Amino acid sequence: MIWFFVTLTAAWVVFNVAASYAPLIIAERISPGRLPAELLALGEARYVRFYVGNNASSYAFSAWAPPLWTVVVFDRSFFRKASPELVRFVVAHELGHAASHHHIWRWFAVVTGLALFPAVRRMLARQEQTADAYATFLTGFKKEFFSQLK
C-alpha cells in the first residue's frame, strides 16, 4: 500500500516538473541580439531564457523550468509591435521576477494548492509590484507610462 502512495507522489512530482516546460512546446527562442544588451548583462539574466509564443493573455510571463532555468515567453504580436522602451521594461520586469525567485514560489504555491488561500494570493499579487519596482529601477520608466501607449 505504501508503494502506491510513493509511486503516486513520484508521478505527481514528475508531471508538475514536466508541466513547467509546456509553454515551450510551440514557442521559439529569441536571439539575445533582439533584447536589451545592458539588461542581459546582469547576473539575473544568466539563467533566463527568452522565447516568443502565442500568449494573448499578457505581454509576457515567466515560469520556472526546473532545476535551473527561468523561461520568459513573450506574446508574438506584442513582441512584433512593441516599442523598444516597452520591451525594455517588460524584460526588466521579468528579470525582477527571476532575481526575486518569484517563479519558484508561484510554482510551489500552485502545485501544493496554497494558491487557493487569500493570504498566499495577496503575497503572489505583491510579487507583481516588486517586479514593477525592479523594472522601474533598471529602466527609469514607470508602469503607468505604458498604460498611455495602448
Locations of regions flagged by a protein language model:
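Generic hydrophobic alpha-helical membrane-segment signal
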Residues: F4, K81-E85, V120-M123
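Short helix/loop segments within enzyme catalytic domains
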Residues: I25-V52, P118-K150
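Alpha-helical membrane-targeting segments
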Residues: W64-P66, I104-R122
